[in-house]
Design a protein with these regions (language model features):
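Cys-nucleophile CN-hydrolase/nitrilase-fold catalytic domain and related Cys-dependent amidase chemistry
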Residues: 15-16, 23-100, 165-178, 185
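CN hydrolase (nitrilase-like) catalytic-core segments centered on the catalytic cysteine
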Residues: 60-74, 144-225
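Extreme N-terminal starter segment of soluble prokaryotic enzymes
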Residues: 1-5
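Short polar catalytic/cofactor-binding loops
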Residues: 7-13
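Short beta-strand scaffold segments in enzyme catalytic cores
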Residues: 78-80, 91-94, 126, 189, ...
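Active-site catalytic loop in hydrolytic enzyme cores
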Residues: 55, 83-153, 167-174, 237-244, ...
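Structural motif
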Residues: 34-35, 135, 157
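Long hydrophobic alpha-helical segments typical of transmembrane helices together
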Residues: 202-254
Length: 254
């Protein structure tokens, strides 16, 4: 599977400007790419004022993603602020080339920023089937909770989209590698750049690790599109040879 990671600065609470920047990046991606991954809250930055910028699932950004996915024959994923029945969600949407959508609502809301006070938490993770791959998409703070991401579904690829600040970037790098190793899964992390309106600095470090924790794409610190191709056959062969997942402890989340 050929995957493109888009790492960019985000304009605070300005969906139109962010869509324009992202679309320019997408238009420069060569054909034959299977999946494009955007950061967390890619239209707004990590704002705790959702009432200013929230959209619906029939809103402009969703329609824009569907139009691009169809035109480019590529899947696109990332999270944005969605409002439903008066509740706000930090929602990852996975738009297929057909325009069909699957979604995941962030389970672990970032209490340090007060996200839990304004957003509604998701209840379960989602595994998406796409081109013969099983993909588990998660959002930012979810990365710190390995029990939630435990690979009981035999997924092939973990995706984390984030607004992860410079002050804790070492944790981002370390935990992405750990999630790859413990779940024997390719793991992608896509983060943003720039400074937000809370004066938090972001230095990117978007990256890809393989199922043994080895770097496929090293942490990146510049604006751009970073592309790699993942090999499912090698993943399967390694899992057969090193079948660590069969020895994991069995338990359920309450």
């Amino acid at each position: 599977m050929k995957i493109a990671l888009i790492q960019i600065p985000l304009v605070w609470e300005d969906p139109k400007s962010n869509r324009v920047n992202i679309e320019q990046k997408i238009n420069a991606i060569e054909s034959g790419t299977d999946l494009i991954v955007l950061p967390e809250m890619f239209t707004t930055g990590f704002t705790m004022q959702p009432e200013r910028v929230a959209e619906t699932m029939n809103g402009e950004t969703i329609q824009w993603m569907q139009s691009l996915a169809k035109a480019k024959n590529v899947a696109i994923t990332g999270s944005l602020i969605i409002v439903e029945e008066g509740k706000y969600y930090n929602r990852l949407v996975f738009v297929f080339p057909t325009g069909e959508i699957q979604q995941y609502d962030k389970r672990h809301l970032f209490t340090l920023a007060g996200e839990d006070g304004v957003f509604t938490s998701g209840t379960s993770k989602v595994v998406i089937g796409y081109k013969g791959w099983k993909i588990c998409p998660l959002i930012c703070y979810d990365l710190r909770f390995p029990v939630f991401s435990r690979n009981t579904e035999n997924y092939d690829l973990l995706i984390y989209v984030a607004n992860w600040p410079k002050t804790r970037i070492n944790a981002w790098d370390t935990l992405l590698q750990a999630r790859a190793i413990e779940n024997m899964s390719y793991t992608i992390g896509v983060n943003r750049l720039g400074v937000d309106d809370n004066d938090l600095e972001y230095v990117g470090h978007s990256q890809v690790a393989d199922y043994l924790g080895n770097a496929v794409i090293e942490p990146q610190t510049t604006e751009g599109v970073f592309i790699t191709e993942l090999d499912k056959d090698s993943l399967r062969e390694t899992r057969k040879k090193l079948n660590f997942l069969k020895d994991q402890d069995l338990f359920k989340l309450l």
